[in-house]
């Protein structure tokens, strides 16, 4: 058995792929979601957003019965390219044993919301399928890169622009010698890092354990022992800033709040919106004005969970002690805004009174992700926004 394996994917017909596969709803407005569901009856949105479990299952089964979704005959790898105007990344979709996650050959870096993981578990259990891949990162491998380059010179089975504004293309690799070569090359890689899909990963692990205990004839070869992963080279992964919005000043006036945070930060008013270009520097938007914030003193070197992670620095030195923000997973006074929205969205949210103030952060770096994962540490939720992301439903 290999580290990463081929599989017989369940996928949409070529003419239906663009209407079946979906972008994460985290990236879409409610209006776009409603219109897409209405105009694309075969979209997976009509499975995930069905009124109940039964309707969801019925819709999924109907898509298979109607041959909107068909299963490949051969064990295959799927080469997957995502392109924007200024970025592209090419990965491979395969399956890995869940034991690789449990044994830390596949490593996560973020805390999860228990309720969200449970929702994912129930959804996959109901459909008896994994519709969207875990998004993984592997250390660059020149031989894999060359192999992939050759394959993408051929015509793709899918090529379309999705609701996320990205171009998505896919190629099938099912020739036995090429499949074996990919398997062997992945066997030289020590570990894969989870970029996105921590809740899905935890749900898959729990679901696999449940099904194992329910099956008296368990062999370890059943499909529930595996999970689907889209793996991209580390050098091609892109992390955007993940910014914060806070509902109120925790009883402070603007003047007193700024006076208080000046005890720990150098605070300077800016003429324009402020996007940090180095670690341990933050932007703050409050009362129609931008400020730069820089820590007066570097944190103690023994506090590893704080060092080099701006999200923790902001929390421990400002959000928690001054604004009273507790665990960001459950505190409804804080919200999160991915960097692809732009800092103008912070201004829009604050100016419309959806939030009292916003903070712009320097993006978490890939070396931070790897360092935390290797040390079995976790970052707070919403620490990284990998962009672009794989679609759900191109292959299941």
Task: Locate predicted features.
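Surface-exposed, charge/polar-rich loops and edge strands
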Residues: 1-396
